């Protein structure tokens, strides 16, 4: 995986609190175990008026022409609550979302997002309010997220955020659990060479 350093992208504002993983990706779409193909089902019950996903809901914000191609999702508190399904960040990533900004995220969802190379940015409620106002008032509004200096820039204003150093290291260097393990491949091979043959 390539690392995440900085991203500037169009923002889609999802002005709802406590969005759970069943809303992000409904259970009927969880049959697959790879990460590809879930984007078309993202927020299915909100994006579409029919079960087949052929009739877009014109009232849902992500279907608005002005937000097509958005790569930054702006949300309210407790985003990603509910079950621990990793399909939720898979769906967001497959749709094209690279950054999520909210006052808070569910803990498991937060970790799963980072494992899938998406950056969940926690700002204060008042800061999120300011960005909502900026995005909704300005078609084509973009924000820049700089992970190296941990700053969000929106409407010529900067907002600082925090992320623990280990997770930041993983994001900057594009490391998932497998990548972290492979960093120690030499030591693993050295250890395996010392194991008695009857234990192999």
UniProtKB/Swiss-Prot annotation:
MF annotations from Gene Ontology: 3-isopropylmalate dehydratase activity
Q: Name one Pfam family in it.
A: Aconitase_C
Keyword field contains Amino-acid biosynthesis: yes
Q: What keywords does the record list, in alphabetical order? A: Amino-acid biosynthesis, Branched-chain amino acid biosynthesis, Leucine biosynthesis, Lyase
Q: Does the keyword Amino-acid biosynthesis apply?
A: yes
Which EC number(s) are documented for this chain?
4.2.1.33
Chemical reaction(s) catalysed: (2R,3S)-3-isopropylmalate = (2S)-2-isopropylmalate
Copy the pathway line from the protein's UniProt record: Amino-acid biosynthesis; L-leucine biosynthesis; L-leucine from 3-methyl-2-oxobutanoate: step 2/4
> What Gene3D superfamilies does UniProt report for this protein, alphabetically?
Aconitase, domain 4
Enzyme class comes to lyase
Q: What HAMAP family is this protein classified in?
A: LeuD_type1
Q: Which family does it belong to?
A: Belongs to the LeuD family. LeuD type 1 subfamily.
Q: Name the job this protein performs.
A: Catalyzes the isomerization between 2-isopropylmalate and 3-isopropylmalate, via the formation of 2-isopropylmaleate.
State the PANTHER family in the record.
3-ISOPROPYLMALATE DEHYDRATASE SMALL SUBUNIT, 3-ISOPROPYLMALATE DEHYDRATASE SMALL SUBUNIT 2-RELATED-RELATED
Subunit structure and binding partners: Heterodimer of LeuC and LeuD.
Protein name per the record: 3-isopropylmalate dehydratase small subunit
Protein's organism: Aliivibrio fischeri (strain MJ11)
